[in-house]
Amino acid sequence: MRILGVNLSNNGSICVLNDGEIELYLEAERLSRKKRDYNCTKLFKYVKNVDKIAISDACWDQHKKKTLISAKNIATLKKKFPNAERYDLRDRHHLTHAACGFYNSEFEEAAVIVVDSSGSNFEEGDECETIFHVKRGRRFHWKVLHKRYNTEDDIGIGFQFDMVSEKCKWGREEAGKVMGLAPYGFYQPSSGLGYLQSSNENAAA
């Protein structure tokens, strides 16, 4: 069975699994030379017939240009692979994070914490933090143990990393770099970033 995974987020990429083995992996920015390119249409020409397609995306409601390009990517997929079974995971943003982390580990069963302030939108609000219980098997077994949503007075940890990244003049899309460096640092009251703590205290009050 050949499965095509498509990531339409700000690191546009595709991956083809052939009977569970990686056959092809490509990132859009490697071909376009545009950092964090999210337009995958140019990648599909390297893919032959597939049986299933799994589509993952970020939440671009506030970015009309990116939303339109995502729609173009999906339209291209439907035209090129009309008989492939499609799984739209765009409303399972935190779940895809959890699955990615879990399947790259050696655990058979685990609790996975996803801290991402830009999760999928639900009636209660945008996903902010989610804890899953996950387990391997013939199918991916998962259960939500806890979920917290963004509110007007609580931006969540993910957006705090966005703010720090902007403070470092890297831009919000480099927040992942800040997260990776965070464990190597320590709190410095004179750093000028203390407003993050005070903003949360005000929100809690």
What is each of the regions a protein language model found here?
Residues M1-A205:
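Short acidic/glycine-rich loops and adjacent helix/strand connectors
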